[in-house]
Amino acid sequence: RLREQEWGYLRTYAELQQLKKERRDYGIFYYRFPGGEAGTDVYDRINDLLGSLHRDFLREDYPQNCVLITHSLAIRLFVMRWFHLTVEEFEQMCSPKNGQLVILQLNDATGDYELVTPLEKDETAVRRSRPIRLH
């Protein structure tokens, strides 16, 4: 379920660069690659995964720690969904570096998870007239 976004059928490096520019101008979350997926498709998979994880967390025999290994977009969408971030907040999140750990840790005092390894922000990312909240 943590499969990265399908980028469709790219023929040339120049085409890839053009599509990346369009995606950045349009917004990473909603842009759909020709013959591929939008960030919303990956978000839906993450949402399904979280439903399963929440059920697993309720089991007494479930381990205290959970490790997810995936790609940068899926990581950012997981963080977006977990913390109920807006699309604008998601689009300002920079991609983690290759091999970077992104750690969510339970705060025993509050009972809430915290992002203890924050992702860098890009304040120049796409801005919308008002934030869009999905949940």
Roles of regions detected by a PLM:
Residues 34, 41, 66-67, 93:
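Short amphipathic alpha-helical molecular recognition features
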Residues 40, 44-48, 72-77, 98-99:
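A structural signal for well-ordered alpha-helical segments within the folded catalytic domains
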Residues 21-23, 68, 75, 86:
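Homeobox/homeodomain signature
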Residues 1-48:
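Phosphate-handling substructures
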Residues 22, 44, 75, 126-129:
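Short, intrinsically disordered low-complexity segments
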Residues 1-15, 55-64, 77-135:
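Acidic, low-complexity terminal tails and accessory targeting/binding regions
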Residues 47-55:
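Helix-loop module immediately N-terminal to the HCX5R catalytic loop
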Residues 62-72:
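Generic beta-sheet signal
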